[in-house]
């Protein structure tokens, strides 16, 4: 296996925000997030036809495997991901930009042992085990399949620092990294914030290690995504929530499954008409996905009500001049309607010449027993500050400021 370092010139492409924490003695920690253009936005601006890429990458089933273990979970659509924070791995810490992903439970980053055949590795921060005094070898194979591609490597153990808290963690050193989307991605890896049952190979997730230390005020974490175009994209708070970023009280919805961030939705309305899910639909609240996703048949009903047209596979557009007149879309969660206006669920790309705007809802079809399931991603979380409560197995929503 090639153990040489990848070129350091690529590090010039990386951003380096400071990770900070609250003053000593407090019992929750903040991780600031940066907002960058998604891979999809970059490709759109360069005039790339997304039809083929959508067909290959908008596949919302992934098989996570360690040796012969395969477990289906909902796939985060990293092609559209925008929000990243920094963590440190090793002693002294090596810094990585990661997506905090409630749809998965493993931590992985690219390794210096990544083959030079995988060009995407050359533009990311790479973990070097020999530079860390706290590294411990594991060596078990690690593979995650994404549609037609895969992320592959092996497991290692080292110190991981998140928001000022350090734990000893087993994580994936990735040695095979697909060109798309990772060649253009602003993030290096993924930090799964899901449950132990979702983790590849029985690895204990990072947040569970943090909980075991007993340092947090509450067994919760919360996510805020800034709705503006600012580079300061939001924050993840471990152990609590930040009232500066939401108004009113949290409304909580109990998990429908105790091993994932999944709840039951009792209605989807467009304008004043309830079109779907009156008998109940399952929905995953996924911080790693940018869009709201629905089964194809359900999405078509919503798009018909909006008058949207399918431009390419699973992607719908409307005339930008039409946006102010589009109806609200509401999701009934725990007996309460959470409403998105057209400015919340329609994306406007200034550089597009066709004057079309993209509806931030995509099609997703997951077969039983995992599906069918909806996904509420950043399109929803930007409007509603979200708290993930492990102690009470529930998710809380409050209107974001």
Swiss-Prot record:
Q: Which Pfam families match?
A: A1_Propeptide, Asp
Q: Which domain of life is it from?
A: Eukaryota
Gene Ontology CC: extracellular space
State its location(s): Secreted
Q: Name one GO biological process term.
A: proteolysis
Q: Which residues form the propeptide?
A: 26-63
Family from the record: Belongs to the peptidase A1 family.
Q: State whether it acts alone or in a complex, and with which partners, per the record.
A: Dimer of a heavy chain and a light chain joined by a disulfide bond.
The protein's name? Renin-2
- Source organism per entry reads Mus musculus (Mouse)
Supply the gene name.
Answer: Ren2
């Amino acid at each position: 296996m090639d153990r040489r370092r990848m070129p350091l010139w690529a590090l010039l492409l990386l951003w380096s925000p400071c990770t900070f924490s609250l003053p000593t003695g407090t019992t929750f920690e903040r991780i600031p997030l940066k907002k960058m253009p998604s891979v999809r936005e970059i490709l759109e601006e360069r005039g790339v036809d997304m039809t083929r890429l959508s067909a290959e990458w908008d596949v919302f089933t992934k098989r996570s495997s360690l040796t012969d273990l395969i477990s289906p979970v909902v796939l985060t659509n990293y092609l559209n991901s925008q929000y990243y924070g920094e963590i440190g791995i090793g002693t002294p810490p090596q810094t990585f930009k990661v997506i905090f992903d409630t749809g998965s439970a493993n931590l992985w980053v690219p390794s210096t042992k990544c083959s030079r055949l995988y060009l995407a590795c050359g533009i990311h921060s790479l973990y070097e085990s020999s530079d860390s005094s706290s590294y411990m070898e594991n060596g078990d194979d690690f593979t995650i399949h994404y549609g037609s591609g895969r992320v592959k490597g092996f497991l290692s153990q080292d110190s991981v620092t998140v928001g000022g808290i350090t734990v000893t963690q087993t994580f994936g050193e990735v040695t095979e990294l697909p060109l798309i989307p990772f060649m253009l991605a602003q993030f290096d890896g993924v930090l799964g914030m899901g449950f132990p049952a979702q983790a590849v190979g029985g690895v204990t997730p990072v947040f569970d290690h943090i909980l075991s230390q007993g340092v947090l005020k509450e067994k919760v974490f919360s996510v805020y995504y800034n709705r503006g175009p600012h580079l300061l994209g939001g924050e993840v708070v471990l152990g609590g929530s930040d009232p500066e970023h939401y108004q009113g009280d949290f409304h909580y919805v109990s998990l429908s499954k105790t091993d994932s961030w999944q709840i039951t939705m009792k209605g989807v309305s467009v304008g004043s008409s309830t079109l779907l899910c009156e008998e109940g639909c399952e929905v995953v609240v996924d911080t790693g996905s940018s869009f709201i996703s629905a089964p194809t048949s359900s999405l078509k009903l919503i798009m018909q009500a909006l008058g949207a047209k399918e431009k390419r596979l699973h992607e719908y557009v409307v005339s930008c001049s039409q946006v102010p007149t589009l109806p609200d879309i509401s999701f009934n969660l725990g007996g309460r309607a959470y409403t998105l206006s057209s400015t919340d669920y329609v994306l406007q790309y200034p550089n597009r010449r066709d004057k079309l705007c993209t509806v931030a809802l995509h099609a997703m079809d997951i077969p039983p027993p995992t599906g069918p399931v909806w996904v509420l991603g950043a399109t929803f979380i930007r409007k509603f500050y979200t708290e993930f409560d492990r102690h009470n197995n529930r998710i809380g929503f409050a209107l974001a400021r």
